[in-house]
């Protein structure tokens, strides 16, 4: 699903450093150059807002087209949860630069620091600019049964992006087998 989203969005992809191991290879497979942006000291999964803006400026100066910011507020590699204020600054910068934010929320329901931050996703702040992606195998169905879900914005670029991603998935016959579809429907109910 992430591959279809990246192919549908086109342009350059900005990733955090560190990020999930499969992000950069999928961007390359989609034909999108991937650029890494360092994370702030207090968390992973989201880029430092100032480093993001500097990276976007540099990519554009070199003739690139930064179109997608892929982040994970509940970060797998670092095991951290991005504070809402940093996440807001990052999303505000990405929206100002006309980028689509893909928020990988596979681990949003995992237990984080008790008494610490409550998960606040980018789509709750900027619903018209964020595609929410989750892999149900992360927490809801057996890992051998691949099933992912994406929630697209209802307005703006959302409908066109959804249509292009759906076309890409249909072209490769990315269909859920009936038992997986039933498990996914149950998990999402």
Residue ranges of each PLM-predicted region?
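Phosphate-binding glycine-rich loop
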Residues: 1-12
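Short hydrophobic alpha-helical segments of the AMP-binding
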Residues: 6, 23-27
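A short helix->loop->beta-strand "cap" motif at the edges of active sites that frequently abuts
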Residues: 11, 32, 96-99, 127-128
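Short beta-strand->loop structural element characteristic of the AMP-binding/adenylate-forming
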Residues: 33-42
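Active-site phosphate-binding strand-loop segment of PLP-dependent enzymes
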Residues: 41-116
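Conserved core segment of the aminotransferase class I/II
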Residues: 124-189
